[in-house]
């Protein structure tokens, strides 16, 4: 199977990258959906979206997970959020490549730090695994994670019989 890949020039161009989306499912109604730069641009986007009852609704349980690299008492926020037409923080500038083979993988570079993030939905279970690999760092490096849980819902699409 061939990989779906995007490079730094494509990822750094928000007009381009915000139009490219990724989707991974657990095959029982849950999914992860966002853009290739991890900026949620649609109401149904999120890292963990799942039905939690027998209703016709899915719930965005985890909207985003913001990562911050800390090195030499300096912080580098890797996140990208859209607020009323503006984008902050602009962490997409640290993304060097995106690859979907079959797991969405994003590589960040901040100075001498190279960090790889892999996102995997577990089939038949509503579980998301995110693995971070510190590929290279020239000095002590810490990673801070901040989850953005939310609890809004939307109706699931239905199949209608003719």
Feature map (PLM): residue ranges:
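Short beta-strand micro-motifs enriched in acidic
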Residues: 120-122, 135
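Short, well-ordered beta-strand segments enriched in hydrophobic/aromatic residues
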Residues: 128-136
């Amino acid at each position: 199977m061939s990989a779906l890949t995007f490079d730094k020039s494509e990822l750094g161009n928000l007009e381009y990258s915000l139009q490219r989306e990724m989707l991974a499912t657990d095959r029982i109604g849950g999914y992860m959906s966002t853009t290739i730069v991890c900026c949620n641009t649609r109401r149904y986007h999120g890292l963990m979206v799942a039905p939690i009852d027998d209703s016709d609704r899915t719930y965005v349980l985890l909207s985003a997970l913001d990562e911050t690299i800390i090195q030499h008492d300096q912080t580098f926020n890797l996140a990208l959020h859209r607020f009323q037409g503006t984008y902050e923080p602009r962490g997409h500038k640290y993304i060097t490549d995106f690859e979907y083979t079959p797991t969405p993988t994003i590589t960040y570079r901040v100075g001498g730090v190279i960090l790889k993030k892999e996102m995997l939905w577990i089939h038949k279970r509503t579980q998301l695994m995110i693995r971070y690999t510190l590929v290279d760092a020239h000095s002590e490096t810490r990673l801070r994670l901040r989850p953005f849980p939310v609890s809004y819902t939307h109706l699931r699409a239905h199949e209608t019989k003719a």
